[in-house]
Regions:
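Glycine-enriched, solvent-exposed interface loops adjoining structured elements
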Residues: 1-214
Length: 214
């Protein structure tokens, strides 16, 4: 008889149990499946930062260098001041060439540009003019999911990733059984499906080269 699975994290766990044919938790405990589900949400946040985007006002520190919210892992955009004036992205190289002393200029309450180089530091960005005490901007950043999403049974990522999360949980489960070549193939297939759901191509060979520890 057909039955409906809820569209929430518990539903992802139920789908994974169905695919793994392990309703009795003979091979994988439910606690372990939940851990993998949280891992999957964190991986989605890294692969698709917009999936966990959070928009909030951010009070700036006096000066040029600013930190993104502590609960986030990268910056997405700084679109405007809290008073409404637009902020445009800029390249540090251009400022260094055109205004060599830009980082030492006087502080202002209205920011005009922000500079972000995630290859150097994902957790900080710079603003111009340097911020004066009391300056604040609208900050869009990518939050890193924590355990609270599991306790509330709510997705920490966009719910469109539910199917991808199911594939991730199944991948992690089968990756514990890769001593069997058949499980290795199935694990790779589910990992590929997860990565495709994130808009990425995947070669899971390196991830599956060793059996996952218990």
């Amino acid at each position: 008889m057909a039955f409906e699975i809820a569209f929430n994290p518990s539903g992802v766990i139920e789908r994974a149990k169905t695919i793994l044919n392990d309703y009795g938790a003979k091979f994988f405990t439910e606690d372990k499946l939940w851990v993998w589900l949280l891992d999957g949400q964190r991986e989605i946040a890294l692969q698709v930062p917009e999936a966990t985007s959070v928009t909030a006002p951010l009070e700036l520190a006096p000066g040029v260098t600013q930190a993104i919210p502590a609960t986030s892992h990268c910056l997405i955009d700084v679109p405007r001041n809290v008073t409404g004036e637009a902020i445009r992205p800029a390249a540090r190289a251009l400022f260094d060439e055109m205004r060599p002393g830009w980082a030492t200029e006087g502080g202002a309450l209205i920011v005009k540009h922000f500079i972000y180089d995630p290859e150097r530091d994902k957790k900080t960005f710079e603003v111009w003019p340097p911020a004066a005490a009391g300056a604040a901007v609208e900050c869009i950043s990518s939050a890193m999911p924590d355990d609270s999403s599991m306790a509330s049974n709510l997705f920490a990522v966009d719910s469109r990733h539910a199917n991808g999360l199911t594939d991730y949980v199944v991948f992690r489960a089968l990756n514990k059984l890769t001593g069997n070549p058949q499980f290795l193939t199935h694990a790779k297939n589910h990992f590929d499906l997860f990565m495709y759901s994130c808009g990425k191509s995947a070669d899971a060979g390196l991830l599956l080269s060793q059996r996952e520890a218990a």
